């Protein structure tokens, strides 16, 4: 899973 989406 991309942790980049956790920024939202």
Swiss-Prot record:
The keyword Secreted applies. The modification Phenylalanine amide is found at residue 8. Keywords: Amidation, Neuropeptide, Secreted. One of its GO terms (biological process) is neuropeptide signaling pathway. It is found in: Secreted. One of its GO terms (cellular component) is extracellular region. Belongs to the FARP (FMRFamide related peptide) family. Can act as a modulator of exoskeletal and cardiac neuromuscular junctions. This is FMRFamide-like neuropeptide 4.
């Amino acid at each position: 899973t991309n942790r980049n989406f956790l920024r939202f």
